[in-house]
A protein has these predicted regions:
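Short, charge-rich, low-complexity alpha-helical interaction segments
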Residues: 1-11
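Short helix-capping and inter-helix turn/linker motifs at the boundaries of alpha-helical repeat units
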Residues: 16-21
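Amphipathic alpha-helical repeat scaffolds
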Residues: 26-31
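C-terminal alpha-helical interaction modules of replication/initiation AAA+ assemblies
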Residues: 9-12, 23, 39-262
Length: 262
């Protein structure tokens, strides 16, 4: 089933439709998307799309994760857009939907601040709850694979306090006015609702292990920075013929140790 992201596949020995090594192509699209290389990203995405459901599944996993981790606050509404695009894709299976997501990811500014916030919060949370994690499975608790553990995590004031501290530190050197932090008082009362919305939105699609938490962090950072999230859905059009170039395998994509395809 396409929307089951839990795959145990050794991509190293799998070839695409036109006999490219799958692991290499996933490395290429990871790194080309991050560098904004649109044509090569589209060429790789089309090859993966044409190669079947398993490849499409992994491609969507990468698009969603890169949007959350690498684009992040660079285009805050894009995470919601890619998620809704994925839902449209499950009904339409049109490459145009992937095309738009790739185009927007390539054209967006990249900002890993939210990913750093998430890592900081997770480390702080684990450090301050050692007794709990000695009795529980750390992987289950952090992966958010059960609603109970994830909601327990989201209810902790430690999360919003850590975000407040981290955001304040990051922005203090960028001429942000002190009055902007007055919005934090409002965030304290509404953040849980909006994080749960993000969590519910991603429950259906089973993204990577940190993506649900990342969605929550993106929403919090958005409220703190007074950014209005774009919840618009992707438009679906008819497939158009595309004259894409041949796939180029850059040297940096062959550094599989830096690859995050999993």
């Amino acid at each position: 089933m396409l929307n089951d992201f839990k795959q145990d596949i050794d991509w190293k020995n799998i070839q695409t439709k036109n006999n490219y090594n799958a692991r290499v192509l996933f490395s290429v699209i990871n790194k080309e998307l991050r560098r904004g290389q649109l044509l090569n990203s589209l060429a790789v995405a089309k090859e993966l799309f044409d190669s079947g459901e398993q490849f499409q599944n992994k491609l969507w996993q990468r698009l969603i994760t890169i949007t959350a981790e690498d684009v992040g606050l660079g285009n805050l509404g894009l995470y919601s857009y890619v998620c809704s695009s994925y839902e449209h894709f499950l009904k339409d299976y049109s490459f145009n939907i992937i095309y738009e997501c790739v185009r927007l990811i390539c054209g967006s500014k990249k900002n890993r601040f939210a990913d750093e916030v998430l890592n900081f919060v997770l480390l702080k949370y684990v450090a301050s709850n050692r007794d709990y994690f000695n009795e529980s499975s750390k992987d289950v608790a952090l992966n958010g694979e059960t609603r109970e553990h994830l909601q327990d995590f989201l209810k902790t004031r430690d999360l919003i306090n850590s975000v407040k501290c981290f955001v304040s530190l990051a922005m203090s050197g960028n001429n942000f006015e002190e009055t902007a932090w007055g919005a934090l008082e409002d965030v304290m009362t509404v953040w849980e609702t909006h994080i749960k919305q993000a969590y519910q939105m991603t429950l259906r699609m089973k993204p990577g292990k940190n993506d649900r938490l990342m969605a929550g962090v993106l929403h919090i950072c958005g409220f703190v920075m007074d950014i209005v999230l774009d919840e618009s859905e992707a438009s679906v059009g008819n497939d158009k013929p595309m004259d894409l170039p041949r796939i180029f395998i850059p040297a940096h994509a062959l550094d599989l140790h830096a690859n995050t395809t999993g």
